Amino acid sequence: MEEEEGADDGEQGEEEVLVVNVGSTYPCKRSDGSQHDAEIVKVRYNKQAGREEYYAHYVGLNRRQNEWVDKSRLVLTKPPKEGETNGTDQEVTDTAEQPDSKTPQKRKIEEPEPEPKKAKVEEKDASKNASSLGAAGDFAEELTCPLCVELFKDPVMVACGHNFCRSCIDKAWEGQSSFACPECRESITDRKYTINRVLANLAKKAACTPVTPVEKKTRPLEKCSEHDERLKLYCKDDGTLSCVICRDSLKHASHNFLPILDAVGVYREELSAIVAPLEASLKVTEQLSSEQSDKIEQHNKNMSQYKEHITSEFEKLHKFLREREEKLLEQLKEQGENLLTEMENNLVKMQESQDAIKKTISLAKERMEDTDSISFLMDIKAFIDKCQEQQRAVISTGNTLLSKELCQGTFKGPIQYIMWKELKSVVIPSLTPMLLDPTSAHPNLHLSDGLTSVRYGENKLSLPDNPKRFSQCILVLGSQGFDSGRHYWEVEVGDKTAWDVGMASESSNRKGKIKLNPKNGYWAIWLRNGNAYKALESPSKSLSLSSHPRKIGVYVDYEGGQISFYNADDMTIIYTFNATFTEKLYPYLSPFLHDSGKNVDPLRFVHNK
């Protein structure tokens, strides 16, 4: 509405503007070119077009044909001004007629309005129509399914008393293991509902009865902001909610669409598929975190025990070995703290991963429990991408349990003997002088007269059989066993290409083929093919040695449950077994076969000279 200049006198005049009243009926040009009486239900201001638009209900027609129109499509009549005639000499009647409620009225242009969108439309007979419009709106709302927001079709009532279209509630519950009312979220034991025939009849009558359209109470974002049509579709390509007009627009050309309820089912299932492995990952992470905490606790206990052992050994060396003691303690501290830091950092990482997984699961479950299809599908793809990113992060970080141990052989070994190697002039440790037991030797083994060395012979010796003798494995035991205390002995292996060195329990099997491992009472290491070292665990473990040892040292701590093997040339640790010993332990040796003459040298116990 504007002020225009007068054509003749240049002064500003007033222009009468025809007013469209809400609740009034006008002839209206329909989109198909026909003309039909239309009742104006509501008004809006179209910012893009810069004009007011009116929601027209075509009297007597289905409400689905209602549409927004501008003033140009309404046939408006201009009422005569006071005192004017119709072109004859008739006098103006003395009686002023009261304008009909459905007769368009005029209004004068007053001051320019600051904002077009704030322009007010006069509503006549508002008080007269308010009651009927409100009642009609409430009635229509009671007959509307809360899921599809349409009149009920084949309505059913669930246990809590809420009603839904049968197809809507079936889609909402599809693929779920537990059920809840989409409206109030009350848990429902069985997937059962009751047909509501009364509501079905009312909905049918409402669909067939022309009802004065009223503005529905809609939830936020229930209508398309661009076309003001109900959002019924979900665009899979753009990840947006769309109306039917959006679907047919160029913007969405060749895009794939799903009905909203179908989209909810698809993406709820996709979220469920993400949550399941995340929950499994959470359980694994929680278990690993618990085990890591136990490892840290045991690690701290071991550090304390090793420190006590080291201190007690070094006290025997007095001030001559103080410098070496401090050096070794520093080594223990550095290695222990490094290992502890690694494990603690790993625990922190696991806990952070655990918290992130819990948060993602919580958000995903909260999203899945959202019964509002509109809010559920808002940015659902971005939310799923975020969940998948968390899933990939769990897989890529690969939560693993760190189970690194302190070097038991270095910190809890024969400390005094190691020190003796460095300080021969200060201390002389006790090296146990071992001898071989001829009653246990395999018939192909030849023992020296002093019972200190053994070699393999091609010819079998004629020896009496007894329970102690090995019948198939080429082994021999030492004559001295240990059932308490700490002991250390050495065997010279020289340049042999194959050998076995270890400890055997007193009751271990000696007959037939024997699998050498701790389960069968054997704790040993061996060499094969000149460079293949193994610890005979179950299963066996390959060992990587920095140098080829010519002498092997064996340390036994019976009460401590420890058997450690060393390169006796420089006292570097090779391997440590841990076990609980319940019977006497004996050294055992095997010089193995000749290997075409490459392995003919004997094995020899080392004695102090």
Curated annotation (Swiss-Prot):
Gene3D superfamilies in UniProt: 2.30.30.140, 2.60.120.920, Classic Zinc Finger (3.30.160.60), Zinc/RING finger domain, C3HC4 (zinc finger) (3.30.40.10)
Lineage: Eukaryota, Metazoa, Chordata, Craniata, Vertebrata
Molecular functions per Gene Ontology: DNA binding; ubiquitin protein ligase activity; zinc ion binding
Entry function: Transcription factor that determines dorsal-ventral body axis.
Acetylation listed as a keyword: no
Residues annotated for Zn(2+) binding in this entry: 224, 227, 246, 252
Record's comment on post-translational modification: Threonine (predominantly) and serine residues are phosphorylated during oocyte maturation, when CDK1 is active.
SMART domains on file: BBC, BBOX, CHROMO, PRY, RING, SPRY
Residues with the Phosphothreonine modification: 103
Residue spans of biased composition, Basic and acidic residues class: 74-84, 107-127
B30.2/SPRY domain mapped to chain residues: 413-609
Zinc finger region(s), B box-type: 219-260
The keyword Coiled coil belongs to this UniProt entry's keyword annotation: yes
Chief place of localization: nucleus
GO CC annotation, single: cytoplasm
Zinc finger (RING-type) residue numbers: 145-185
Biological processes per GO annotation: innate immune response
Entry protein name: Nuclear factor 7, brain
This protein's UniProt keywords: Coiled coil, Developmental protein, DNA-binding, Metal-binding, Nucleus, Phosphoprotein, Transcription, Transcription regulation, Zinc, Zinc-finger
Family matches, as SUPFAM superfamilies: B-box zinc-binding domain, Chromo domain-like, Concanavalin A-like lectins/glucanases, RING/U-box
PANTHER family: E3 UBIQUITIN-PROTEIN LIGASE TRIM
One matching Pfam family: PRY
